[in-house]
Structure formats: structure tokens, C-alpha cells
């Protein structure tokens, strides 16, 4: 409550009698007011705050205790902690594997989410004997930290804490097709050293464009000997199978307490409450699902998700994430081959009672729900899963096969690469090809990684479509080297999501929006050059919609150029009519389309860029922003090389100078990428 202040000088009068009388009255009013306020404060407010103050102290103490990972390590006898920055679950999986490794060397490890702890506590780590901190850090997007490592990254940038005595190691997860390969891992490794921490093993750089699993195994098999040498310890024995979770079967449980696919809060899908994010997705109804292309070879689709009443806000260039479900046919086949009743309700409870992660996925739930909504059953399993499963193969040759692929030998790595990775064998295929391998379904559920959200560039502008989010995607289906037909989880699931008819129920998609740096220029007059073949055109549909909307508002809008590519005009020309209309209306200044298969020689977007190089250079010199969306492995690299050539030729520069010129555009936010591999 604010203090009251009365300026009595304004009451001065020429008549002394009136002045005295007035002052007396004012004093009485002030005195009464002060007495009243004091009475209220002591008798009422104080009583009301006595209990809340005590409660707040308790909460604060609890929060501090939980955020101090060093105190937790002391309490539980741990000396190794592995933090993970993970967007898709792989870094978390690697962290779990490293923490489990520790027991082989007479140590105790724990994996941890940096979002759950105060990393300033690192300076206290030397209080624990033979303490080591390891970071498994993935790089997301264009050199960004993952969502759960953002606070840690911000802290590293701002802090000047002395980390002398802290022993550390870093393994980074990245992709060489991206411009900023492993930026987060490199930054954490460098910054920790700058703050005085001691690196006890070299930085590991995993490449998801190559063989990330092999990169990790190679680093890991050299990492542990270095740890042993540094701390003077020896391995206690061979790697052994240790269960992390205990199975509890619920024979009589209230159905209202069973998870049915929710990502966070129980029954959150029945009682939706904003704000919506990765841990609390919004169930959006599908209002449109139409095929964009004419050919039968591929299925490209446009979906619209209704976000009205969700309070979700997005901007052109943002990403929409959806949580898919696995194919029920695959789930049923898994249940059949394992001889399991998929409708049994169970919980997997962490045997480590001190762990923050009580279950590998929301529990209690049924095996059917876990295999449908929570577990990844379509990606090739990693080597640690094969090692754990090998014990359940009754046929010696199959057990040997699995153990060899899980080994660090050159022969084992090659076998894993060819038999699992390149053949795209998922867990069901492995069980089918190893007839004697029949693990308990609960252990399999413990071993399989979590099914992750899928991200798509939003193909709409919130200025035009504030109550819906649009998705453009190609349905994935292919034949493996082993002759099986594999289908993309999310795209096939989305394909089946038909808008509700008169008598049908609504088709719902759990979703949330992730903010992006892929943004239109602040000034509408700034020219934009957009390059996006295939489904890479998605964010540019939103960009063009927004520029068209600005024109309708009477705003001056700069040149808007699109370089789009597809196979044939009559097969996969996405949004053909919409783009043509934008061009006719003047919202799209130039519409340049490369058809790669309509003539004897291939024509790609970079060829069209070269043809327009003089005009493009003029726009770039005039402050234009360049946007590239689509395949990172080939297209984005070729387009970037083309811009190097354009800058070198028309800017009269050496190649190195042209490269530096484009790099500076990236730094200034004038050359933006939204790419995938």
C-alpha cells in the first residue's frame, strides 16, 4: 500500500482564526486516517500475511534444494553428472548412456536436464571428490541452443564465475550440412575453459549427416580410459545389463488416473488450459486436408489447423510442432510377436528414487498407449538397445549378431551400419529377422526412445489467418534395402486426418508453435529474395500473404521475388494457382519456377538465380534480405555457392571476399536459412 501525503501549505489563509481552525480540522483528519491505517495494518494485514510468509519460505527453501545439483550429488553419492541439451531426445539418450557407464568404473553417475537446475552451482562441484561434469549438447536450427539449454547458454554468456577446479568434457551433436555445425557444443567447450574449468578429454563432434551413433561410440570408447587415467581408477568389469525401471502392473485402477496419450498433465486433452507448449500441446481440429499435386507417385498435402480460442499467436516463418501417433498396425504386430496383452495398464517406476525422472513416459498407462503415442518404434534402434536385447535371444547366432553390432570393433560398426542403419530396420523388423529374440515387453518399452514432435514451417500468415495454422508436407513412404515398405510416422498420420463431416467427429492434432528467427524484414519496403523448392515454399506462402496484406493496408512494399523449383509443372507444382494470383495482383514481383524434369537437362533454382544475377546483385546492394528454405544437404549449399559466385562476379571480389560478404549478411540477419536434412 502506498503512503498518503498531504501538502498542508495549500491551506494557508490570511485570517488567523480561519487558519487555526482549518489546521485543527486537518490535523484531526490526518490523525484519524493514520490511526485507522495502523489499526488495519497490525490487526488485519499482518494476520493475513503470517501464514503466506511462512509458506513462501518453505517453497523457496525447497526450490533452492532442488536446483542445487551439487547438493543432490552429495546426498546420493554421485560424482559424475551428465547434462544434456536435447531437442529430439538423442542428446538425452547419450547422456543416460554415459551416466549408466559410470558404474563400470566404480563411479556413480546421473543425467540431468539443465533447465531443472541452477548451473551457477558448477563452481561448487570441486567439493565432491573425483567429480566430473559432462555436457551432451545438441545444436538446433542455425547454431542455436536447444529449448532446454537456452537458460544455460544465456548464463554462460553473462557469467564471469570462477570454475577453477571443475573437470569437464563435452560431446556435441550436430549436422555438417548446416552452416553452424555443432555451434553449441563448441561454444560450451570453449566457454568453460575460458571460465577456468579443466577439460579432461577432447571435444566430441557428432555428425547426424554421417553416422551419429558411430561418432558417439568412437568418442565414448576413448573418453572413459581418459577419465580412468585422470582419476586413477580402473574398470570394475564388462558392460552389464542394468534395469533402470521397475514394472508395476495395475490390475484395479481408476480409469481417470490412466494416461491415454497426454504429453504432460493427466486429462489435459479433456480440459485444455493455455499457455500451450511442448509439455502442454493444444488439440487443434483439422479443417482442411487437400492434396496439392496431381501425380500419383507422391502425395503432397496442405492442412489447416484451427487454433481459435487457444490464445496461440504465431508469426510468418515460425514452426508448428505436431505430436504424431504410430501406425496401429505396427503396434498390433509388436504386441503379437511378443505375445503381450497390449491393454494391460502398467507403470515403469525409476529404481533410483532420487531421480527427477520418475518414469520413461507418462504413467500409469497401457502398453498400447505407450507404443502408440510415447515410444519411437520406426527408427533404427541404437547399439545400446541391441546390446540390452541380446540377452533375450535364445539362438546363439542371433545373440552373437546383436552383440557384435553393439560392440566398438570395426567389424561390428560396419555390420550395424549396413544391417540396421542403411537397411532402415526398426524394432519390429529386427524381431521378425531374429525369430528367437523375444524380450519382455516392459524392458523393450524401457529401452525404446521417446516419440518426438515433428516440426513444419508454417505456410500461412497470422495477419491473414489469425485463427489457423497451415502445414505443407510430403507423405513419406519408401522401400528399404531389405525389401520392406517403411512409412513416415507423422506425414502418414496427418494424411489420414480428414476434416469432420456432418456426422463424423473432429480430427484432432496435438500441436504447439515454436518461435523462429526466420522473419520478414521490419521495414516492408525492404526487398526480399526467397528461394524454396518443393515443400520449402511453405514459409514463403506466409511471407507473400503478409506482403499482400500490407499492400491492401496501403503500405509501400518492396520487391518480392520467389525462386521455386519442382519436377514438372503438371505433377508437383505446389500452390500453383495461389502463386499465379499473387503474381497477377503484384504482391509477388517475380515468380521464377525451375522444372527439373521437363527438359533433357536438369534446371534447378540456382540456375535461375545465375540468370538473374545482375538484378539480384542490385537488390542485395540495396539492402535486400535473402531467405532459403528446404534441403540442407544439396540445395541450400548449391544456392549459397551461387550467391558466392554472384557476389564475386558483380562485386569484383575474390572468392574468399565473397564468402565473407555472405557470412556478414548472415550475421546481420539478411541471409536466413530454414533448412533440414
Curated annotation (Swiss-Prot):
One annotated GO molecular function: NADPH-hemoprotein reductase activity
Record Gene3D superfamilies: 3.40.50.360, NADPH-cytochrome p450 Reductase, Chain A, domain 3 (1.20.990.10), Nucleotide-binding domain of ferredoxin-NADP reductase (FNR) module (3.40.50.80), Translation factors (2.40.30.10)
Bilayer disposition of the protein: Single-pass membrane protein
Sequence ranges on the Cytoplasmic membrane side: 43-677
GO CC aspect terms: cytosol; endoplasmic reticulum membrane; intracellular membrane-bounded organelle; membrane
FAD-binding FR-type domain span: 279-521
This protein's record includes keyword Hydrolase: no
Localization: Endoplasmic reticulum membrane
Lumenal side: 2-21
EC number in record: 1.6.2.4
Annotated transmembrane regions: 22-42
Residue positions binding NADP(+): 298, 535, 596-597, 602-606, 638
Residues that hold FAD according to the record: 424, 454-457, 472-474, 478, 488-491, 676
Stated consequence of mutating residue 605 to F: In DISPORD; significant reduction of activity
UniProt-annotated binding residues for FMN: 86-91, 138-141, 173-182, 208
Functional description taken from the UniProt entry: This enzyme is required for electron transfer from NADP to cytochrome P450 in microsomes. It can also provide electron transfer to heme oxygenase and cytochrome B5.
Involvement in disorder: Antley-Bixler syndrome, with genital anomalies and disordered steroidogenesis: A disease characterized by the association of Antley-Bixler syndrome with steroidogenesis defects and abnormal genitalia. Antley-Bixler syndrome is characterized by craniosynostosis, radiohumeral synostosis present from the perinatal period, midface hypoplasia, choanal stenosis or atresia, femoral bowing and multiple joint contractures. Disordered steroidogenesis due to cytochrome P450 oxidoreductase deficiency: A disorder resulting in a rare variant of congenital adrenal hyperplasia, with apparent combined P450C17 and P450C21 deficiency and accumulation of steroid metabolites. Affected girls are born with ambiguous genitalia, but their circulating androgens are low and virilization does not progress. Conversely, affected boys are sometimes born undermasculinized. Boys and girls can present with bone malformations, in some cases resembling the pattern seen in patients with Antley-Bixler syndrome.
Name used for this protein in its record: NADPH--cytochrome P450 reductase
Organism expressing this protein natively: Homo sapiens (Human)
Organism classification: Eukaryota, Metazoa, Chordata, Craniata, Vertebrata
Gene name tied to this protein: POR
Amino acid at each position: 500500500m502506498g503512503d498518503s501525503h498531504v501538502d498542508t501549505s495549500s491551506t494557508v489563509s490570511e485570517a488567523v482564526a480561519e487558519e487555526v481552525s482549518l489546521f485543527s480540522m486537518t490535523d484531526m483528519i490526518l490523525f484519524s486516517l493514520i490511526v485507522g491505517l495502523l489499526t488495519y495494518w497490525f490487526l488485519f494485514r499482518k494476520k493475513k500475511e503470517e501464514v503466506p510468509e511462512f509458506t513462501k519460505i518453505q517453497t523457496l527453501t525447497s526450490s533452492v534444494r532442488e536446483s542445487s545439483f551439487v547438493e543432490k550429488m552429495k546426498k546420493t553419492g554421485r560424482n559424475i553428472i551428465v547434462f544434456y541439451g536435447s531437442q529430439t531426445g538423442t542428446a538425452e539418450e547419450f547422456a543416460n548412456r554415459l551416466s549408466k557407464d559410470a558404474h563400470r568404473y566404480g563411479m556413480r553417475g546421473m543425467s540431468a536436464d539443465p533447465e531443472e537446475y541452477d548451473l551457477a552451482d558448477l563452481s561448487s562441484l570441486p567439493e565432491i571428490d573425483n567429480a566430473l561434469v559432462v555436457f551432451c549438447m545438441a545444436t538446433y536450427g542455425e547454431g542455436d541452443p536447444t529449448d532446454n539449454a537456452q537458460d544455460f547458454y544465456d548464463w554462460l554468456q553473462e557469467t564471469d564465475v570462477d570454475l577453477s577446479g571443475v573437470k569437464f568434457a563435452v560431446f556435441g551433436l550436430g549436422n555438417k550440412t548446416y552452416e553452424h555445425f555443432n555451434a553449441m557444443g563448441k561454444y560450451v567447450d570453449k566457454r568453460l575453459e575460458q571460465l577456468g574449468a579443466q577439460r579432461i578429454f577432447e571435444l566430441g563432434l557428432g555428425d547426424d549427416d554421417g553416422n551419429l551413433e558411430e561418432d558417439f561410440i568412437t568418442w565414448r570408447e576413448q573418453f572413459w580410459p581418459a577419465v580412468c587415467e585422470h582419476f586413477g581408477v580402473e574398470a570394475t568389469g564388462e558392460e552389464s545389463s542394468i534395469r533402470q525401471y521397475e514394472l508395476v502392473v495395475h490390475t484395479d485402477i481408476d480409469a481417470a488416473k490412466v494416461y491415454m496419450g497426454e504429453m504432460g498433465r493427466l486429462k489435459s486433452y479433456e480440459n485444455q488450459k493455455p499457455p500451450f507448449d511442448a509439455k502442454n500441446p493444444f488439440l487443434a481440429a483439422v479443417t482442411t486436408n487437400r492434396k496439392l499435386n496431381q501425380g500419383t507417385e507422391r502425395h503432397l498435402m496442405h492442412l489447416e489447423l484451427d487454433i481459435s480460442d487457444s490464445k496461440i499467436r504465431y508469426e510468418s516463418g515460425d514452426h508448428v510442432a505436431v505430436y504424431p501417433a504410430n501406425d496401429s498396425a505396427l503396434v498390433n504386430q509388436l504386441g503379437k510377436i511378443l505375445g503381450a496383452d497390449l491393454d494391460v495398464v502398467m507403470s515403469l517406476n525409476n529404481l533410483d528414487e532420487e531421480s527427477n525422472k520418475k518414469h520413461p513416459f507418462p504413467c500409469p498407462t497401457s502398453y498400447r498407449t505407450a507404443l502408440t503415442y510415447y515410444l519411437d518404434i520406426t527408427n533404427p534402434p541404437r547399439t545400446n538397445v541391441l546390446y540390452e536385447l541380446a540377452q533375450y535371444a535364445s539362438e546363439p547366432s542371433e545373440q552373437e549378431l546383436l552383440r557384435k553390432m553393439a560392440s566398438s570393433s570395426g567389424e561390428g560398426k560396419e555390420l550395424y551400419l549396413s544391417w540396421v542403419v542403411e537397411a532402415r530396420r526398426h524394432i519390429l523388423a529386427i524381431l521378425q529377422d531374429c525369430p528367437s529374440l523375444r524380450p519382455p515387453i516392459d524392458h523393450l518399452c524401457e529401452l525404446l526412445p521417446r516419440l518426438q514432435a515433428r516440426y513444419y514451417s508454417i505456410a500461412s500468415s497470422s495477419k491473414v489467418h489469425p485463427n489457423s495454422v497451415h502445414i505443407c508436407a510430403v507423405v513419406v513412404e519408401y522401400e528399404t534395402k531389405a525389401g520392406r515398405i517403411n512409412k513416415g510416422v507423422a506425414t502418414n498420420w496427418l494424411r489420414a486426418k480428414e476434416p469432420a463431416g456432418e456426422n463424423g467427429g473432429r480430427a484432432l492434432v496435438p500441436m504447439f508453435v515454436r518461435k523462429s528467427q526466420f522473419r520478414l524484414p521490419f521495414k516492408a519496403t525492404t526487398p526480399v529474395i526467397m528461394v524454396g523448392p518443393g515443400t520449402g515454399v511453405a514459409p514463403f506462402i506466409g511471407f507473400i500473404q503478409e506482403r499482400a496484406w500490407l499492400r491492401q493496408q496501403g503500405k509501400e512494399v518492396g520487391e518480392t521475388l520467389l525462386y521455386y523449383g519442382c519436377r514438372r509443372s503438371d505433377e508437383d507444382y505446389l500452390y500453383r494457382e495461389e502463386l499465379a494470383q499473387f503474381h497477377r495482383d503484384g504482391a509477388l514481383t517475380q515468380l521464377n519456377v525451375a522444372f527439373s524434369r521437363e527438359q533433357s537437362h536438369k534446371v534447378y533454382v540456382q540456375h535461375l538465380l545465375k540468370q538473374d544475377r545482375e538484378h539480384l546483385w542490385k537488390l542485395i546492394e540495396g539492402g535486400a534480405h535473402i531467405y532459403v528454405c528446404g534441403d540442407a544437404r544439396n540445395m541450400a549449399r548449391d544456392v549459397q555457392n551461387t550467391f558466392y559466385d554472384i557476389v564475386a562476379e558483380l562485386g569484383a571480389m575474390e572468392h574468399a571476399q565473397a564468402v565473407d560478404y555472405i557470412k556478414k549478411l548472415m550475421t546481420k540477419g539478411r541471409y536466413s536459412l530454414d533448412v533440414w536434412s
